[in-house]
Amino acid sequence: IQRVLDAVAAEEQLTEDEIVTLFSARGPEVNAIAEVADQLRFEAVGDTVTWVHNRNINYTNVCTFKCRFCGFSKGPMSLNLRGTPYLLTLDDIAERAREAEELGATEVTLQGGIHPDFDGDYYIDVTHAVRSAAPSIHVHGFTALEITEGAKRLGEDLVTYLGRLKEAGLSSLPGTAAEILDDTIRAELCPDKITTAEWLDCHAAAHEVGLGSNVTMMFGSIEHPRSWAKHFIVTRDLQAVTGGFTEFVGLPF
């Protein structure tokens, strides 16, 4: 552990094996890692902590995908679960955004299932509706899966499609749909979902058009520490090129 921490202090880029070594830390070793991490955090952003007042708007729970871990969608593997399928109207979505802004929210997050009837223009329409209803609010919306599906259904490339979303009022992308960026694990967890490369391509395109995004990582299911290391490395490598990721969010399974 100390050898790896020395490499961190020397500003060396950690290898997959070195990251796995850090994940093996126990007891006092964890404290040592935390101290180094805290110092790096201080050097990067200081001690000021900020937050946003956010409202999540999940516009549909209908989804054609078959992710084995999902506790939300009502699709092919969950037809008798989780209540009644729903799809909010554009007016419903706009009203929720307007209400959020009036209550002091600074951000809305837009996510939902991959509805079989959506075309790519649906996400453009949702963005327009939210921006019109809540002009000052930050619109944080649409997973890489939604973006990829929307572009595909319109026959557009990602840069063109994301540019249209930005023009409609989109401010940034969430990192969800990443789950764990290790395709061996994804083949078990979410076999019909986008691949690691497709997730990265979507976020690279978002950064290219000037949209920031974040990285999420779902952990605690069937993956292992090497999967975590792979996830960190591929997102670290993209960040080195684009600088477009604004935060990392760990999501316990």
Where are these regions (language model features)?
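Flexible, acidic/Gly-rich N-terminal and inter-domain linker regions that tether
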Residues: 1-64
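Conserved, mostly hydrophobic/aromatic
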Residues: 11, 37, 67, 110, ...
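Canonical Radical SAM [4Fe-4S] cluster-binding loop centered on the CxxxCxxC motif
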Residues: 49-92, 115
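Conserved radical SAM core fold
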Residues: 76-77, 107-109, 114-117, 144-152, ...
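Canonical radical SAM enzyme core domain
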Residues: 79-94, 115-166, 178-179, 194-198, ...
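Short Fe-S-cluster ligation motifs
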Residues: 91-112
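Conserved C-terminal portion of the radical SAM core fold
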Residues: 134, 138, 166-178, 197-253
